[in-house]
Amino acid sequence: MNLEKVRNIGISAHIDSGKTTLSERILFYSGRIHKIEDVRGGGDGATMDHMELEKERGITITSAATSVTHNGYHINLIDTPGHVDFTVEVERSLRVLDGAVLVLCSVGGVQSQSITVDRQMKRYQIPRLAFINKMDRTGANPRRVVEQLREKLGADAFLAQIPIGAEENFRGVVDLIEMVAYTFEGDQGEKVVTGEIPADLKDEAEEARVAMLDSLSNYSDEVMELLLSEEEVSKDMIYRVMREAVLNGATPVYMGSAYKNKGVQPLLNAVTQYLPSPLDREIYGRDPSDEEKKIELSPDPDKPFVGMAFKIVEDPFGQLTFMRIYQGTIKKGEAYTNQRSQKKERFSRIVRMHSEKRDEIDEAGPGDIIAVMGIDCASGDTYCSERDYATLESMYVPEPVIKIAVNPLNRGDGDKMSKALQRFRKEDPTFSVYTDEETNEILISGMGELHLEIYIERIRREYGVEIEVGAPKVSYRESPTREVEFNYKHKKQTGGSGQYAHIVGKLIPIESESEDSFEFEEKVVGGRIPKQYIPAVEKGFRDILGKGPIADYPVVGTRIELLDGSYHDVDSSEKAFYTAAQGCFREYFKQAAPKLLEPIMSVEIEVPEEFQGTVTGDVIRRRGLMTSNDTNEGMTVILAEVPLAETFGYATDLRSMTQGQGTFTMELAAYRQTPSNIQEEIIAERKKDELAGAR
């Protein structure tokens, strides 16, 4: 395969921007499917949405992967979910892509999930194009969307096309490089007709072209000089500089209406012209024997194989592992080593995926995205042809914010349910399962109500198990707010040798809410505590952080400075110092004025203007803090920060407040102190649960 002609791209966006519809048209125009299906309503549902639930709800839950050919280019296309509860799917697919298309709605513009996706693209330094979809909608305003790209995302965005006609009269686009008009004919827009720019758009097109060249001049001294001397910039130069600009962070903007079959083919051309091939990306692995040491990987088919498992799906035929190959070649029947588990596994079946259909292949080389059947691994694992060759850094996985108790209605279904939960846990790192020690309930936790609802629904459908679901529970945290000095002795005299440990130091609050935000610093001088006991002190403190003294929630934002202490030649041991650290924490943490922290969600609500007052009042009643509201073309977008505890059941409430016309998304913004009256309620509730559990 000629690597220059390979593109690994993702299609990312806010929910309901028409992303899956766009993917569907790309499959159709590249000849991969012969009939267009719509996302909602009758028919078979979109090709990329292959899970029953996705077809019903009209949202994309898991990233489907498929490959298409366009103008001699091989494009691996990943359709990612737009709903914030499925963010990890987006993280996973971006990690293995070389480029992306950010889809925006011509009316909604840059919405909360577009901002999240943008942040993820920046994290993985992914060059991208923007596509303004739904140009046929009332209120379509592409220039406003470009402004928002600049202001809200800080993107260097500029128009590469302008629209011909507006709203229901949208007919096509003007290409600002070729300076021609493209309109779309045939039953399904498959015929692209090139014509002259309509007379009434000539001036606007000239202006937009000047603005585009002006933006490109920031990436090329040559273009800058030609513009300054008022000379013509050749088309070849514009194409070349446009590609350099995209690889260096520029975002050219294309437009169309995927649903009305307009504007998709020019976008596909731009994908092949400007987005990077695997040869354009620098990829580094890490040396397993030295984490600090980077290893440059090259897309060379003859070098040792390095690939990353970025998605795992269990299907009736066993585990299906999606993999991106960064270096070397994999061959059917050969064995490769999982760098984490050090297990060697035979790749007996390699397939190229088209949504859930699969084509068997014998080998695959660098830059390709394929799936391997029947290997046992976890998402994020690196495979190589040799042991300890390289690991690819793992993906960023956000911490879960909501948990609920689940029980099978029929006792005999316990095994089936636990099999399903273990499978989902393997597929999705943001989904976890554990047993509550006090109540013995099975708890599942995830990124939001919809996230967990979908899994419960999948257990019902795929495993035939009816589930009883408890009320959602919030993952609170406990945190100190005042510095305290401690001086703690642990003495125990039993028959034979006793236990003795003495520690002195400070417990200091620090700004952080992640579960691993514990700092430990040892400043003991003169061997007052022998070096071999220090790790036991740190471990004692670290191990007790899982359950804080206020209400048994994890403790965060804590720093321990160990300053002094004493020991006994006979009675001191690692165990004694470990126990001392735990006893010290129990006694002194209460003196540090500990507070409960609660997850605060950043919520974006979109409602028809006439419901604005009702919805705003409801947000305030939920202890919400309004950050902005913006009304445009009869729709109001409200941004607010609301405690997670107050959002349960919000989807239903919003539907009834807005006659089914309101939509919302939310994601974790931060952990903040809980008001004292709420804190007292939570503690009382915990005590009640404990008493109930003890009975």
From Swiss-Prot:
What InterPro entries is this protein classified in?
Answer: EF-G-like_DII (IPR053905), EFG_II (IPR041095), EFG_III (IPR009022), EFG_III/V (IPR035647), EFG_IV (IPR047872), EFG_V (IPR035649), EFG_V-like (IPR000640), P-loop_NTPase (IPR027417)
Q: Where in the cell is it found?
A: Cytoplasm
Entries under Gene3D superfamilies matching the protein: 3.30.230.10, 3.30.70.240, Elongation Factor G (Translational Gtpase), domain 3, P-loop containing nucleotide triphosphate hydrolases, Translation factors
Q: What keywords appear on the UniProt entry?
A: Cytoplasm, Elongation factor, GTP-binding, Nucleotide-binding, Protein biosynthesis
Q: Which domain of life is it from?
A: Bacteria
Function per UniProt: Catalyzes the GTP-dependent ribosomal translocation step during translation elongation. During this step, the ribosome changes from the pre-translocational (PRE) to the post-translocational (POST) state as the newly formed A-site-bound peptidyl-tRNA and P-site-bound deacylated tRNA move to the P and E sites, respectively. Catalyzes the coordinated movement of the two tRNA molecules, the mRNA and conformational changes in the ribosome.
Name the record gives this protein: Elongation factor G
Which organism does this record belong to? Answer: Rhodopirellula baltica (strain DSM 10527 / NCIMB 13988 / SH1)
